């Protein structure tokens, strides 16, 4: 994706120096999301919170986005009364604390489906994924990153997405 370099106040970690031309701010990254995209958000403790917050706080967010996710924890904002403040439509396969208020507000479609079926549905195109927002480990000596603790439905979303935006987490462990 063509982009301008990150602002000078944005420090690129040493581990990412060899990939400096691919490092952008969260705001720049989510700026590549198009109107009408179906955006998969990584799950559980591997939810890319910085990317989600950048998308939610974008000055001119893309229109008609659908955020698709399974299990999220403290990923989406709520006001002091507990109401969801998301700006987008959501589709979820799990009703956790993040989504309860939004479901009551009519902002989320709950799809009762076993998580074991979700990867097949994505692969068959029955669940659309245009963009995948994920969290990964820093690259190893060969430039490979790891999905770490979240290798549930993320591989299916990555393989189907037109655009994959990864938030690098230095604390993410590597998995095989």
What does each of the following model-derived ranges do?
Residues 1-176:
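Conserved alpha/beta enzyme-core scaffold
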């Amino acid at each position: 994706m063509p982009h301008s370099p990150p602002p000078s106040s944005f420090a690129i970690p040493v581990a990412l120096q060899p990939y400096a031309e691919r490092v952008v701010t969260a705001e720049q990254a989510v700026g590549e999301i198009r109107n009408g995209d179906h955006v998969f958000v990584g799950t559980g403790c591997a939810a890319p919170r910085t990317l989600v917050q950048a998308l939610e706080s974008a000055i001119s967010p893309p229109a008609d986005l659908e955020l698709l996710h399974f299990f999220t924890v403290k990923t989406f904002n709520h006001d002091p009364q507990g109401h969801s403040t998301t700006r987008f439509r959501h589709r979820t396969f799990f009703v956790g604390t993040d989504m309860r208020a939004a479901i009551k507000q009519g902002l989320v479609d709950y799809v009762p489906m076993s998580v074991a079926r979700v990867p097949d549905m994505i692969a068959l195109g029955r669940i659309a994924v245009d963009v995948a927002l994920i969290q990964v480990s820093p690259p190893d000596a060969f430039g490979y990153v790891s999905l770490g603790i979240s290798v549930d439905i993320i591989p299916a979303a990555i393989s189907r997405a037109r655009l994959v935006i990864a938030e690098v987490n230095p604390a993410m462990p590597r998995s095989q």
